[in-house]
Amino acid sequence: MGVNAVHWFRKGLRLHDNPALRECIRGADTVRCVYILDPWFAGSSNVGINRWRFLLQCLEDLDANLRKLNSRLFVIRGQPADVFPRLFKEWSIAKLSIEYDSEPFGKERDAAIKKLASEAGVEVIVRISHTLYDLDKIIELNGGQPPLTYKRFQTLISRMEPLEMPVETITPEVMQKCTTPVSDDHDEKYGVPSLEELGFDTDGLPSAVWPGGETEALTRLERHLERKAWVANFERPRMNANSLLASPTGLSPYLRFGCLSCRLFYFKLTDLYKKVKKNSSPPLSLYGQLLWREFFYTAATNNPRFDKMEGNPICVQIPWDKNPEALAKWAEGRTGFPWIDAIMTQLRQEGWIHHLARHAVACFLTRGDLWISWEEGMKVFEELLLDADWSVNAGSWMWLSCSSFFQQFFHCYCPVGFGRRTDPNGDYIRRYLPVLRGFPAKYIYDPWNAPESVQKAAKCVIGVNYPKPMVNHAEASRLNIERMKQIYQQLSRYRGLGLLATVPSNPNGNGNGGLMSFSPGESISGCSSAGGAQLGTGDGQTVGVQTCALGDSHTGGSGVQQQGYCQASSILRYAHGDNQQSHLMQPGRASLGTGISAGKRPNPEEETQSVGPKVQRQSTN
């Protein structure tokens, strides 16, 4: 009797650099590649039509590539725990291979399947290929906890073994005598479903700006490396209006679904750098966005509450407002701020926005203007973004809302000035908000300031054809910066809580090839700052707020740990008005000083005015 094997695709929807699939094929007589799709999940999950379309296109491309190997993809309806016991028996399976999933939900699911496989006498092969590193080894190297600063993360990976090279693509030679049993009714039983079959209405659905699949991903990778003149000099290009549009060299959705191997991208960049720079060793900054992705994966892997505020040991408990009406206006692009509304319109239509556009709308929703929880924004991105990734999406929203990691809370993106500096003519606004097309560049970012005659000439009266601004940005941002200031003053006065960590500069490209939901550590013009103050370390490095968990080995602390983090235990009072808001934050033994020095006062046209007097130098002892 021959050896029958199954490879279970989840992410990693590719034939190149797929070590689990290669290992599965070795020694097998038959192999079936399966993807398990839960139709109920399709109808009830918080995932929009663009992302589902991208996934189905990935599956269609994978099936087409498997056909070239005289194989097929088996798309099976159901839930893994129900499907596999049947498949093990029906197909007489001897071994099952999977790509390692680092997310808490994925680890729990895979543990259940491994148990079922063991009971059925099925060998399970697991290989790491969705991340560059073994995340557990990074955590082990850090004393059993994930590093909570990017600088610490960089230090740890510099001590790791060199990365393994991508494995050979699956070819007919790799398959050798391994075959795939395919029945005549395969398409009927195991074909890739359509959007209509999943319950989506496709009437009026425009063509995909981002076609899914490994074939497209590899084409884009070559374009990405060829087109980027900046790669030759390894300089970051300046942001401009064209950067805001989807690029044929963008890679982020393909990395998220695993159509493109992060290791292949890493080594292609390395080879190019060495070719241009005559074999000199590339700096870590070359891989900036790949490493930020890895950083958030590491932070999230042992924290099932990573996407929540409550019960999340690394998240500051901030009393966000609950305002469903304001949230809906933001999500639907009806804020009355053209820059924000154009971004949200592009996101809903195309499933992608530039990483700095993500900064702008996230800041506006949370600490900038609306004071609505980052969790709500994260859910909208999860629905609409093609590259929405559980770990990176949640980590980025916590970071940008000043809820965790590092951030200069006194910086606030201006919803008028930031866009105007990026695209002075307003072409981006006209593209996604045609109702404003008739406005001259002078008023297109703040049309409410246009004289009535200009509004009528543009055939768009503010308050009638396009909404008035939903908030007064200057007032809202002042209030919210003050709120954040009070929260962090309370935290910094609390003995035993380390708050500051240096944030290295991060080369992010022009965003079109960006790999992340956000790109932390970037200083952008068009942001306001409170008090004209800049945090500094004295060595020229930027400083942001960092919540250090108890027992974090690089703070010198120690204590009780739970799933790699400390247990939250201390109540902090939020000093705003009546001082009655309670905040839960974990203590740490080490206390870090806060150095603050005066900085340049912002331009009042482009940025919100400073808030109150300059902050004086403080320290906690």
From Swiss-Prot:
Q: In which residues does the motif LIR 8 occur?
A: 379-384
- LIR 13: where is this motif? 492-497
Q: Where is this motif: LIR 11?
A: 430-435
Spans annotated as Disordered: 581-621
Name the cofactor(s) required for activity, per the record.
Answer: FAD; (6R)-5,10-methylene-5,6,7,8-tetrahydrofolate
Query: Motif LIR 7 at which residues?
Result: 335-339
The places in or outside the cell where this protein is found are: Cytoplasm; Nucleus
Is Flavoprotein among this UniProt entry's keywords?
yes
Short motif LIR 9, span = 395-400
Motif window: LIR 5: 271-276
What would be an example GO MF term here?
Answer: FAD binding
* GO biological process terms, semicolon-separated: circadian regulation of gene expression; circadian rhythm; entrainment of circadian clock by photoperiod; negative regulation of DNA-templated transcription; negative regulation of gluconeogenesis; positive regulation of protein ubiquitination; response to light stimulus
Cellular component terms (Gene Ontology) = cytoplasm; cytosol; nucleus; photoreceptor disc membrane; photoreceptor outer segment membrane
**Chain span(s) of sequence motif LIR 1:** 50-54
The answer to whether keyword Nucleus applies is yes
UniProt cross-references to InterPro entries, sorted A to Z = Crypto/Photolyase_FAD-like_sf (IPR036134), Crypto/Photolyase_N_sf (IPR036155), Cryptochr/Photolyase_FAD-bd (IPR005101), Cryptochrome/DNA_photolyase_1 (IPR002081), DNA_photolyase_N (IPR006050), Rossmann-like_a/b/a_fold (IPR014729)
Location of the Photolyase/cryptochrome alpha/beta domain: 3-132
Show where the record puts the motif LIR 10: 411-416
- Motif placement: LIR 12: 486-491
- Motif LIR 3, residue range(s) on this chain: 151-156
List where the motif LIR 4 lies: 255-260
Query: What is this protein's tissue specificity according to the annotation?
Result: Expressed in the pineal gland.
Give residue numbers for sequence motif LIR 2. 82-87
User: Induced by what?
Assistant: Up-regulated by light. Higher levels in light/dark cycle than in total darkness.
Subunit (UniProt): Component of the circadian core oscillator, which includes the CRY proteins, CLOCK or NPAS2, BMAL1 or BMAL2, CSNK1E, and the PER proteins.
Name the UniProt record assigns to this protein: Cryptochrome-1
Organism listed in the record: Gallus gallus
